[in-house]
């Protein structure tokens, strides 16, 4: 259940951004969660609703989540592909030599503050 610590860090980051921008209220938080991030989205939402109550700045914030697909760059044929299933090879040339471009992380994309 690492979602607890991730949500706690997210709220701290939002509070820090608000203070740095002389805002007193975060209204909307937009995040992008990668398919391979290991984050359970429903649990993440529940943790957010619980933890935001302890924050004066984020207490009324709404959370918006975008799911990022798993995107790879094949190091053999230079093809960029989105993998729909957990088959870790290039769909074009079948190579297993690739670099993950997106889909492993959580990113804070945007804050709406007042």
UniProtKB/Swiss-Prot annotation:
Q: Which GO BP annotation is one of this protein's?
A: protein modification process
Q: Which UniProt keywords apply?
A: Metal-binding, Nickel, Zinc
Q: Does the keyword Transferase belong to this entry? A: no
- Member of which family? Belongs to the HypA/HybF family.
The residues that the entry says bind Zn(2+) are 74, 77, 90, 93
> Which Gene3D superfamilies does the UniProt entry name for this protein?
3.30.2320.80
Binding of Ni(2+), residues: 2
Q: Which HAMAP family match?
A: HypA_HybF
The gene behind this protein is hypA
Q: Which Pfam families does its entry note?
A: HypA
**Full protein name:** Hydrogenase maturation factor HypA
Upper taxonomic lineage? Bacteria, Pseudomonadati, Campylobacterota, Epsilonproteobacteria, Campylobacterales
- Chloroplast among the record's keywords? no
Instruction: List the molecular function annotations (GO) for this entry.
Output: nickel cation binding; zinc ion binding
- List, alphabetically, the InterPro entries matched: Hydgase_Ni_incorp_HypA/HybF_CS, HypA/HybF
């Amino acid at each position: 259940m690492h979602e607890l610590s991730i949500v706690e860090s997210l709220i701290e980051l939002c509070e820090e951004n608000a203070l740095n921008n002389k805002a007193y209220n975060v209204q909307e938080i937009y995040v992008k969660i990668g398919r391979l991030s290991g984050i359970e989205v429903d649990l993440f939402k529940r943790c957010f609703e619980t933890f935001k109550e302890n924050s004066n700045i984020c207490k009324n914030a709404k959370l918006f989540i975008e799911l990022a697909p798993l995107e790879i760059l094949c190091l053999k044929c230079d093809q960029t592909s989105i993998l729909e299933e957990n088959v870790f090879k290039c769909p074009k040339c079948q190579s297993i030599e690739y670099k993950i471009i997106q889909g492993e992380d959580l990113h804070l994309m945007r804050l709406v503050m007042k």
